[in-house]
Amino acid sequence: LEDEAAEAIVHVSLGDLRKAITALQVAASLSSTVTRDLIYETTATAPPEELHGYLLACKEDGFQPARRRLKGLLDKYGLAGTDMVNQLHRGLGEVAFLDEKQKLAVTEAMAETDFRMVEGGGEALQLDAMTATICSLIGK
């Protein structure tokens, strides 16, 4: 078990020992060396830096690059749309390149997206709308 893998287990388990044990068991069943990347891939969790990268793409690159980055995250980590929104929300407080006002506006956009998806709105369209809104709120 690599040190970074242990930190990843703490991150994905959110203090739930059962989740931590399950994450370790699944990763160990696939490889004799449990790595950070393996933990994130097997728990359908995007690493914090990947989520920050998506928000940075919204800020600096615009809609299409941010949209591609989001799709890549969903595909690579097997995330459902609501999981993506929840993980983004969880990590938003640590995004240094956004001020408090921007974080508030992004939180509102994520909440609206989550609500619409839970109510049955199409995931792809809702995530695109969220990306467009975030780009408008924090973009150059």
Language-model region placement:
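C-terminal helical "lid" of AAA+/P-loop NTPase domains
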Residues: 6-12, 18-32, 40, 53-56, ...
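Helix-rich C-terminal "collar"/helical-bundle subdomain used as an assembly and partner-interaction module
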Residues: 54-140
